[in-house]
Structures are given as C-alpha cells and as structure tokens.
C-alpha cells in the first residue's frame, strides 16, 4: 500500500505519522512544524529575549544537538546569539568521543565553543576519580548523583565565562516526565513543586535557565535529527546503567504503552502542582563558601566536594549532609587551573 500524501504540503509522500497528533507528514514539513513549535515555546514563554547571549549546554548527544541546530535556525528571528558550552566530566573512553562530536558541530555550524572540565573547576576531581572514591557503595547511583550536581555547576561557570545571559539545555518531554516520576517515588515534595514550568528565572544571581524542547517527545527529537541528518554521539554513559533514572524510564514506557499521553500528562501535572504552605521548603539562601543558591549552609556542589575531600563521599548525599556540619574542615583540594575558551578547530 503506497504511503499517503503529506497532510501539510499535499505534494510529497508522508514519511511519518506524528506520535502526538497522528498527522501524516513528509520529512521537510515535519521539521518545519517541529521548529515552529519550539519557536512558539520560546516566544510564548518569554524564555529568550532579543539580545540574549545564550549558552547552549552541548553534550554531543541527540537532544543537545537538536537544540543547538533548531536555535541556530531560529536565532535571526529571535534576535539572539549562541555559544556552545561543553562539560568534560573526565570519563575515560566516553567523554572524548562525545566532545569530538561537539567540536564537529561547532565547526560545521560556525558557532563558538568553550569546554570546561571538572578537573579544572573542582580541585582535580573527575568522574572517574569520584567512581573510584565511591566504589563498593552503590557506585553507579552515587556517580549519577555527583555528576548531576557538578555538571549543573560546571555549565553555569562555563556560561559566565563566555558572558552568557541565559542557559539552555536539551531536556525533552520524556526527560521531564522521568524526573517527575523520580521525585514522586522518592517523596521529594520540594523538587516536585519546583519541577514545573519551562525553566528557572535565575534567582539569587544564578543565570536564567530554560528548556525549549520540554514539550517535544523523545521520539520526535530523534525523528528531527534523522531528517536533518544531524551528526551526534549516541553511546550511553558507562556509569548510567544502574542509575535510578533508568527504572523511572522503564516505568514511563509501561505507562505510555497503556496511555500514549502519559508523558505530557506528567509534564503538565508538575506545572499545575502546588504545595500546602506548611509543606513548602524555606526560600533558598546563599552558600557560605561559593555564594551559589543553597537551602543549607553549603550548596549541593560544595557539600559533595567536601565529602570527597574528607574521604567520605556518601556522607554528602541525602540526609548524610547534616553530618558535614559536625566535622572539621576538609582536606585542602588540589589547586584548580584557570578556565580558558577552547578555539574551534578547522575541519
């Protein structure tokens, strides 16, 4: 049976049926619709004002690759400028290949690129070193806890280094639905309440962050990358298989099989969630060490680094953080090297 005609241009043969709407589109019309929807998300949400210098968190994976490509297409209409910021977590045999993909993208799209490294920012600590430090104590799960906090801080530092006014990340609807499930299963009411919306306004001196792909499903992100023939890195992190997020992802797939709208339902439910006044966490203050937003004396990044430098990495996770205040000062970390912008190589 021949493929139906594209429901948009009525000329080309349809190449796909959109998972959300069931509309049959050719590849070109699908990509145009995808870009128009991202544009609407940005404009309607007032996420990136004209004149914004936008740091794009670039990992080399499909989501950040699609985000960078779409924003590059939309930049003239939005009146924004882009700067790719990549984070080198120090994961041997994995991150080097991903960074190579980012460098190819930067060269092909003529976008400036800056790479910041954990080792430079965090006293010599890399994720491989963190993994060795947490070996034998739920290593993979602990690694993801450390990496999520440190990567967020590294991206913020990289964005400041390049003079960015806003930070964007490639989180899609599936990512956000998984996060909602994780916070619900952990009983983390505070994070559930903070998880709604398309980003954060930049409280306490932090740069405003947003997620322009938050309403786009993972399937459509993959389809866009396919039809635009984008070059991206697709291997999973070596520390990811045992992470709690994987269990939330499996649960989400089962929910989606029974209810196709489950992903966006979860995303929108987080936006509508409101906590009772007695359940709301206190307003964040400033970290006593680095000045970043913090709900306690130390922010998450400083608390995790304290645990590592004391040789007790698990102490800084969850309720164990309270114990850090009762101990003496940590060992002095190794001196950090200054951050530098990395020129884009010629390819």
UniProtKB/Swiss-Prot annotation:
Pfam families: ATP_bind_3 (PF01171), zn-ribbon_14 (PF16503)
Main location: cytoplasm
Protein's gene: CTU1
EC number: 2.7.7.-
Region of interest: Disordered: 315-347
Record key words, sorted: Cytoplasm, Phosphoprotein, RNA-binding, Transferase, tRNA processing, tRNA-binding
Key word Phosphoprotein present: yes
Cell compartment(s), UniProt: Cytoplasm
Pathway: tRNA modification; 5-methoxycarbonylmethyl-2-thiouridine-tRNA biosynthesis
Family: Belongs to the TtcA family. CTU1/NCS6/ATPBD3 subfamily.
Biological function: Plays a central role in 2-thiolation of mcm(5)S(2)U at tRNA wobble positions of tRNA(Lys), tRNA(Glu) and tRNA(Gln). Directly binds tRNAs and probably acts by catalyzing adenylation of tRNAs, an intermediate required for 2-thiolation. It is unclear whether it acts as a sulfurtransferase that transfers sulfur from thiocarboxylated URM1 onto the uridine of tRNAs at wobble position.
CDD domains in the record: CTU1-like
Official protein name in the record: Cytoplasmic tRNA 2-thiolation protein 1
Organism annotation: Bos taurus
Modified residues (Phosphoserine): 200
GO biological process terms on file: protein urmylation; tRNA thio-modification; tRNA wobble position uridine thiolation; tRNA wobble uridine modification
A Gene Ontology cellular-component term: cytosol
InterPro entries found in the cross-reference section: CTU1-like_ATP-bd, CTU1_C, Ncs6/Tuc1/Ctu1, Rossmann-like_a/b/a_fold, TilS/TtcA_N, tRNA_thiolation_TtcA_Ctu1
Complex and partners: Component of a complex at least composed of URM1, CTU2/NCS2 and CTU1/ATPBD3. May form a heterodimer with CTU2/NCS2.
GO molecular function ontology, one term from the record: nucleotidyltransferase activity
